[in-house]
C-alpha cells in the first residue's frame, strides 16, 4: 500500500505591540509577495519546533511563547496550514535567504493586494478582528 498524505505547514504570526511582522518572499510560489514566516515541517520535529525554525530562518526571530491560532485546510493541494501567534519581546529582525525584506505593519498599512496566500489573508483577518489576542482564540477555515 502506498499512502499519499497531506503536507503540514507550520508558521508564526509574530507581532510586536500592535504591529504584525510580514516577510517578502524571495522564492516561488509568490516571489515578491508578502507572507508570514512559515514552511513545511521537517521529519523528526514537532509542529512548534518547525514553526520556530521557520521564523528563525526567514526573519531571525526567537518565538518563545507560541499560541495555536489558525488551522487552514487546503484540500486542492493537499496541505494543512497550522499557525501560531507569538508576541515578540523586541522588534529586531534579520532577513534570511528565503526573504527579500521584512517589516512590521500596523493593521491599516498591511499590503493586502500583495499578500501571498489565502491562508495568510484568512489568518491576518482573524488576528486583526480579534486583537488583542487572548489564550482562547482559535480559528478553522
What are the residue ranges of the model-derived segments?
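A generic structural signal for short beta-strands and their flanking turns/coil linkers
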Residues: 8-10, 30-32, 64, 80-82
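Acidic, metal-coordinating catalytic segment for phosphate/diphosphate chemistry
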Residues: 1-12
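Conserved beta-strand and immediately adjacent loop positions that scaffold enzyme active sites
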Residues: 11, 19, 101
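Conserved Nudix-box catalytic region and its N-terminal flanking loop in Nudix hydrolases
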Residues: 15-57
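Unchanged
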Residues: 41-126, 133-141
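Short glycine/proline-enriched turns and hinge-like loops at secondary-structure junctions
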Residues: 6, 33-35, 78, 96
Amino acid at each position: 500500500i502506498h499512502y499519499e498524505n497531506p503536507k503540514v505547514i507550520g508558521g508564526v504570526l509574530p507581532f510586536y505591540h500592535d504591529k504584525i511582522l510580514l516577510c517578502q518572499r524571495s522564492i516561488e510560489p509568490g516571489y515578491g509577495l508578502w507572507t508570514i514566516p512559515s514552511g513545511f515541517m521537517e521529519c523528526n520535529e514537532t509542529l512548534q519546533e518547525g514553526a520556530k525554525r521557520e521564523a528563525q530562518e526567514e526573519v531571525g526571530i526567537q518565538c518563545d511563547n507560541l499560541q495555536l491560532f489558525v488551522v487552514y485546510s487546503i484540500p486542492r493541494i493537499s496541505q494543512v496550514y497550522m499557525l501560531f501567534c507569538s508576541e515578540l519581546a523586541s522588534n529586531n529582525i534579520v532577513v534570511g535567504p528565503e526573504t527579500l525584506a521584512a517589516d512590521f505593519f500596523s493593521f491599516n498599512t498591511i499590503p493586502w493586494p500583495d499578500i501571498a496566500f489565502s491562508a495568510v489573508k484568512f489568518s491576518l483577518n482573524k488576528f486583526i478582528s480579534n486583537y488583542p489576542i487572548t489564550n482562547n482564540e482559535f480559528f478553522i477555515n
